[in-house]
């Protein structure tokens, strides 16, 4: 597998930021997508140990939500599915405070986070990138998938 270019986005809730996304097959080519085009599908609930009320993150008034999107292109959709399947079982250590969603669209692995605490968001992203690196190296080690 070749080195993948990734598009990153970080916007505050309600911001009209844009997401930069790499186009598969065109190294260095990026498409700009409005950040609101891909909302986080699930509302996140506060941790039971939190001093805040049990209102989902997306419904708390006056709370700033940090969002981060990562788009990782793969040479084939099968490799993207393999990577997604390998990364989905990893449980988020701060489940009630950080939400993570993985999805495959064609050859692109899409990962989205939402959190109130930017430090927990950063920790989750760093852990994910470590795991992603391991998965990509493993795919490279075993070579491209064989079609039956």
From Swiss-Prot:
What's one GO BP annotation on this UniProt entry? tRNA processing
Listed Gene3D superfamilies: Alpha-D-phosphohexomutase, C-terminal domain
Alphabetical keyword list = Cytoplasm, Nucleus, tRNA processing
Residues covered by region (Disordered): 1-21
Predominant localisation class: cytoplasm
How does inactivating the gene affect the organism?
A: Mouse embryos display primary microcephaly characterized by significantly shorter cortex lengths, cortex-midbrain midline lengths and cortex widths. Mice do not show a renal phenotype.
**UniProt signal peptide:** none
**Where is the protein localized?**
Cytoplasm; Nucleus
Any single Gene Ontology cellular-component annotation: cytoplasm
- Tell me the Pfam families matching this sequence: Pcc1
Quaternary structure per UniProt?
Component of the EKC/KEOPS complex composed of at least GON7, TP53RK, TPRKB, OSGEP and LAGE3; the whole complex dimerizes.
Role summary: Component of the EKC/KEOPS complex that is required for the formation of a threonylcarbamoyl group on adenosine at position 37 (t(6)A37) in tRNAs that read codons beginning with adenine. The complex is probably involved in the transfer of the threonylcarbamoyl moiety of threonylcarbamoyl-AMP (TC-AMP) to the N6 group of A37. LAGE3 functions as a dimerization module for the complex.
The record's comment on protein family reads: Belongs to the CTAG/PCC1 family.
Protein's name according to its UniProt entry? EKC/KEOPS complex subunit Lage3
